[in-house]
Structure formats: C-alpha cells, structure tokens
C-alpha cells in the first residue's frame, strides 16, 4: 500500500494545441463556405444544429478562425440593444449609435464596407427573445453569409418565421462522436499512453456520442489510473466503474 501511494504516476504525453480534428468542425466550415459561395440571387443563411455536447461551439470557433468571420455567442438575457452592441464590438465599431435602429444601420454599413461572414452561436436564445427578424434585416441588407448554431429543435423553431425560414440555404445536423472520434480526443489530450483503445471506445458508446462527456470521462479515467498507480488502463481494468453520461446512477451502478 505504501509503495502504491508513493509510486509516481506515469507522465502523460503533452496535450496538443488547438482543436481535435473532429467531423463537426469540417461540417461547420463546409456549411459556412456553401453559404459564402452561394449565387448572387440565393440566400446565405446556414444552420448547424444538434444535441448539447456535440462540439458545435468548438466547430463554430474553428470555422470563424478559418474564415475571419465575426463570431458572437448569444446570451439568455440579451435585449435587442445587447445583441447589436455585441455585433458592433466584434466589428470594431468604437462609437456605436445611441438608438437601436441607427446602430443596426451602422452595423449594416460596416458589413457592406468590409464584408465578413457572421457566426451566431446559441441562436436558440435569439429565437426565444423574438430577435430573428434582426438577423434577417442584416442578411437582406448585406451580401454576407450567416451561420447560426443551435440545438436539435432549432430548424423547427425557425419555421415560425416563414420569411426567415425560406432564406435558409443549408441546414446541417451536427454528428455524434464516433469510436474513431473518441480515439482522436484521447490522443489530442495526450492520454494515448494511459487509456487503451477499447476503453476510449467504451466511453464513446456509453456517452452516446456526446463529445463533452467523452472528454470528461477520459480525463477522469486518467486521474483514476494515476491515483491507483497504474500505467495503462483498458476496458477490462475499468470493469463496473461508473461512466458519467448524464444518466441518474442506480443503487446497483453505485455498487450498493
């Protein structure tokens, strides 16, 4: 026991910088590019939607970095003014107009002067606050592509605004993480020398493809291995230990 407690944990490989190259990053970029390259008489609104934890925000940030897009993340308490101020700040407008209509005009003028794609994360907040038409105003008054990121029900929610809905050029569903993605995530975070393939794949299956939960379980497993002084762990070693996947633990799963 003393040896186990004093034994140094194996040093994991250094985590890689940037993002793990998961498919949803390519899907976000592809959707934005398709909107950007639309014909002159076509709309340029795009959607990337899917369940929470599928890595949509990371995908959106990647697409923004690759294209120089204006990126904003909507907040639950935003007013119309707060939305416009966030856009103005990202566009570098240092003297925003005092009224919302004039600030909207200022944003449109800036986007026409120096066009850049716009990415709006957490679009569901704007739908809930009835601010969809502001996005349409910007779209119709400029030539920019707008990519909106939201939850699984976002496409159906937007059908309430027919004039907005019929301007959506492409709607792309985000994909759950696969077994291969779990291995990419493990390697990206420098855990490939600690966690065997079959355990990483097991986490992907139990977490139903939710990227965030897969990463949480990979890190928790690495900490468990370090605590117990084990160099490498696999599915057999993990055994009946809990996997955090959003399910409510039962007495049996808790070993009671």
Task: Walk through the language-model features, giving the residues of each.
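C-terminal alpha-helical "lid" subdomain
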Residues: 1-27, 53, 57-61, 163, ...
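Pre-Walker A adenine-sensing motif
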Residues: 25-40
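Walker A/P-loop nucleotide-binding motif
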Residues: 38-61
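Conserved catalytic segments around the Walker B and adjacent sensor/switch elements
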Residues: 46, 64-76
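Sensor-1/coupling segment of RecA-like P-loop NTPase cores
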Residues: 46-52, 138-162
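A short helix-turn-beta junction within AAA+ P-loop NTPase domains corresponding to the substrate/partner-engaging
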Residues: 68-69, 159-176
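Mid-core helix/loop region of P-loop NTP-binding domains shared across ATPases and GTPases
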Residues: 79-85, 94-141, 145, 157, ...
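Short, hinge-like loop/turn segments at secondary-structure boundaries
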Residues: 88-91, 114, 163-166
């Amino acid at each position: 026991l003393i040896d186990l407690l004093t034994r140094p944990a194996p040093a994991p490989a250094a985590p890689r910088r940037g993002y793990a190259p998961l498919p949803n990053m390519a899907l976000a970029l592809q959707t934005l590019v398709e909107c950007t390259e639309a014909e002159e008489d076509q709309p340029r609104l795009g959607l990337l939607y899917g369940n929470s934890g599928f890595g949509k925000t990371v995908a959106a940030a990647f697409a923004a970095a690759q294209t120089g897009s204006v990126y904003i993340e909507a907040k639950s308490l935003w007013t119309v003014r707060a939305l416009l101020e966030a856009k103005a700040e990202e566009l570098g407008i240092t003297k925003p107009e005092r009224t919302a209509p004039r600030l909207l005009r200022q944003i449109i003028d800036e986007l026409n002067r120096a066009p850049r794609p716009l990415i709006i994360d957490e679009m569901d907040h704007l739908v809930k606050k009835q601010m969809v038409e502001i996005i349409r105003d910007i779209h119709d008054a400029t030539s920019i592509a707008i990519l909106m990121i939201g939850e699984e029900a976002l496409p159906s929610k937007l059908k309430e605004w027919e004039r907005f809905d019929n301007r959506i050029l492409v709607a792309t569903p985000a994909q759950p993480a696969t077994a291969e993605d779990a291995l990419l995530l493990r390697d990206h975070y420098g855990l490939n020398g600690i966690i065997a393939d079959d355990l990483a794949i097991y986490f992907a299956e139990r977490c139903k493809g939710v990227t965030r939960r897969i990463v949480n379980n990979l890190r928790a497993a690495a900490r468990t291995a370090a605590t117990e002084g084990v160099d490498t762990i696999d599915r057999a070693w993990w055994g009946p230990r809990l996997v955090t996947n959003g399910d409510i633990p039962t007495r049996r799963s808790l070993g009671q």
